[in-house]
Amino acid sequence: GLIGSIGKALGGLLVDVLKPKLQAAS
């Protein structure tokens, strides 16, 4: 449904933002 789609979009955005920080930290 709509809520699931929004959740997926936010989750993808979060991963895009956090992944570079995690890679930079390691």
Curated annotation (Swiss-Prot):
Assigned GO CC terms: extracellular region
Tissue: Expressed by the dorsal and submental skin glands.
Pfam families, sorted: Antimicrobial24 (PF16049)
Cell compartment(s), UniProt: Secreted
Domain of life of the source: Eukaryota
GO biological process: defense response
Keywords: Amphibian defense peptide, Secreted
Main location: secreted
UniProt name for this protein: Citropin-2.1.3
Organism of derivation: Ranoidea citropa
Source organism phylogeny: Eukaryota, Metazoa, Chordata, Craniata, Vertebrata
